[in-house]
């Protein structure tokens, strides 16, 4: 059975002020990837530092694709400021455990080895879950290239509070159905996809990269600066472009968000159906988990994803089918090089306003035609976002992008005023003011600011990265932890190794868990 779409009349039944008062109580979580580098900006060749705990089982600090690619995760919290502070504590802890290394401040990678296979995959020990993680990463390298997988980013996890949902849906929490909650989050996801190009312009920080990332650009045209730097003049987020986290193979799958059933059905197809090119990779043992379009659900690239927390060895799709959507994961944020922790409060506050607007506006199903138009908008902004002449698709006609973006940002102000009224601060209105400046002057966007500085100072991308990384290291070396943080992190380091050892004592499983509830 398809879940019902929320209508504007349903939205208007509930007082906007009451809704927004409760919206302040949403839950937030942050994940951030960062490369460990040597003082000269080259990728670290060392294993994951033992003092940071096990990269398999530590709750706060793991590794992503590559062994030197740190992945931080904060607890879900009712105030995003607490997430940022926790992320800061994790950086302080890391810097004080690293001997002579730095944390790279950009989404685009540092100086990479000449041979792609010299980029070390994450290593997680001899347990079956640890081995699967490394095999999965080996498969990613075969499919998309190891260089591409070294791009890092920030993920913002968001869920509405139960009090907010009770007010919005007009019923007691005990009467919620998973279908209603899932429908609400899919409503938000569809509208977010209709607005994500605005967020990409405002937060994109990757218009430039080191040539070792893309030694042979092929037909893609980049400008060269000095000896080692390539850039695209008006680009905002090359991380989200075809040289980053996109896949033409995945684009053929037709995965949409019009209903949970449709989404899960297409994802089930993707994780169970072999793709001819990938079949050949499986000739070598442990080359990949399987030859399917997606080895596992996490391989799917999208600016936003519906999520449910799996239990034990449960697959994410089974978790979604059993319990519905619990939260959404926004994956379109570049690392902010002008924030030591890689993300700033103003950008997250503005993102929250977009999510609220996405909920409080009608959100019809996305047709194939609209899906094409939305992808065209996003791709245009990725490559030409700071071009003052850029036009995008808006309701079937072309509009100047910067005019449309400024107008949209200003339209969120009435939400911001109500939220600020209930928090007693001007956080949300200041977030809008912060973004409006970027619409008035593209050089104030992080992508414009970064590229302008590199060109005007006549320095290399790698030089700017080292400079920022050293500044951040000095700052984190002097900052104080939040109370109790050091003891908590030291205990987690010990606990993570104990759990890893227990996993390695268990009987080895030979097959990755299958999705039980798929019909494919």
Swiss-Prot record:
Keywords: ATP-binding, Glutathione biosynthesis, Ligase, Nucleotide-binding
Pathway the protein contributes to: Sulfur metabolism; glutathione biosynthesis; glutathione from L-cysteine and L-glutamate: step 1/2
The enzyme's E.C. designation: 6.3.2.2
MF-aspect GO terms: ATP binding; glutamate-cysteine ligase activity; metal ion binding
Keyword ATP-binding: yes
Domain of life: Bacteria
The keyword Methyltransferase belongs to this UniProt entry's keyword annotation: no
GO biological process: glutathione biosynthetic process
Gene Ontology cellular-component terms listed: cytosol
Reaction catalyzed: L-cysteine + L-glutamate + ATP = gamma-L-glutamyl-L-cysteine + ADP + phosphate + H(+)
Signal peptide residue numbers: none
Family (UniProt): Belongs to the glutamate--cysteine ligase type 1 family. Type 1 subfamily.
Protein name: Glutamate--cysteine ligase
Source organism (scientific name): Leptospira interrogans serogroup Icterohaemorrhagiae serovar copenhageni (strain Fiocruz L1-130)
Lineage: Bacteria, Pseudomonadati, Spirochaetota, Spirochaetia, Leptospirales
């Amino acid at each position: 059975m398809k879940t019902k779409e929320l209508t504007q009349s349903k939205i208007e039944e509930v007082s906007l002020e009451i809704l927004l008062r409760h919206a302040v109580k949403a839950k937030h979580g942050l994940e951030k990837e960062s490369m460990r580098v040597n003082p000269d900006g080259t990728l670290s060749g060392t294993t994951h530092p033992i003092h940071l705990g096990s990269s398999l089982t530590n709750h706060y600090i793991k590794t992503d694709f590559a062994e030197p690619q740190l992945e931080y995760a904060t607890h879900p919290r009712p105030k995003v400021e607490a997430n940022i502070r926790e992320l800061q504590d994790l950086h302080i802890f890391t810097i004080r455990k690293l001997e002579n290394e730095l944390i790279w401040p950009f989404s685009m990678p540092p100086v990479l080895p000449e041979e792609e296979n010299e980029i070390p995959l994450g290593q997680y020990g001899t347990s079956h879950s640890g081995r699967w993680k490394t095999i999965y990463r080996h498969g990613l390298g075969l499919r998309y290239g190891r260089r591409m997988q070294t791009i890092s980013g920030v993920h913002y996890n968001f869920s509405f509070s139960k009090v907010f949902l009770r007010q919005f849906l007009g019923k007691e929490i005990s009467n919620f159905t998973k279908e209603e909650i899932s429908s609400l989050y899919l409503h938000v996801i569809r509208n977010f996809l209709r607005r994500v190009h605005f967020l990409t312009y405002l937060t994109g920080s990757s218009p430039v990269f080191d040539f070792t990332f893309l030694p042979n650009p092929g037909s893609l045209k980049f400008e060269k600066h000095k000896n080692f730097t390539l850039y695209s003049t008006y680009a905002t987020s090359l991380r989200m472009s075809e040289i980053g986290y996109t896949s033409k193979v995945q684009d053929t799958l037709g995965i949409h968000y019009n209903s949970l059933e449709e989404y899960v059905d297409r994802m089930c197809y993707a994780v169970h159906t072999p793709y001819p090119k990938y079949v050949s990779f499986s000739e070598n043992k442990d080359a990949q988990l399987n030859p399917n379009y997606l080895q596992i659900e996490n391989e799917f690239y999208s600016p936003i994803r519906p999520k449910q927390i799996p239990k034990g060895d449960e697959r994410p799709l089974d978790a979604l089918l059993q319990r519905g959507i619990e939260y959404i994961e926004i994956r379109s944020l570049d690392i902010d090089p002008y924030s030591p922790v890689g993300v700033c409060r103003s950008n997250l506050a503005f993102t929250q306003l977009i999510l609220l607007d996405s909920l409080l506006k009608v959100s019809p199903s996305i047709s194939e035609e609209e899906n094409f138009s939305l992808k065209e908008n996003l791709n245009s902004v990725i490559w030409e976002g700071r071009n003052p002449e850029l036009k995008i698709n808006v309701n079937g006609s072309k509009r100047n992008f910067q005019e449309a973006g400024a107008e949209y940002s200003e339209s969120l102000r009435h939400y911001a005023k109500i939220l600020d009224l209930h928090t007693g601060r001007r956080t949300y209105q200041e977030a809008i003011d912060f973004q409006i400046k970027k619409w008035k002057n593209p050089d104030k966007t992080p992508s414009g600011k970064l590229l302008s500085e590199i060109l005007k100072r006549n320095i290399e991308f790698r030089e700017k990265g080292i400079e920022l990384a050293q500044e951040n290291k000095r700052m984190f070396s002097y900052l104080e932890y939040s109370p109790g943080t050091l003891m908590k992190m030291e205990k987690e380091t010990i606990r993570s190794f104990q759990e890893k050892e227990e996993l390695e004592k268990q009987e080895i499983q030979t097959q990755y868990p299958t999705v039980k509830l798929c019909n494919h």
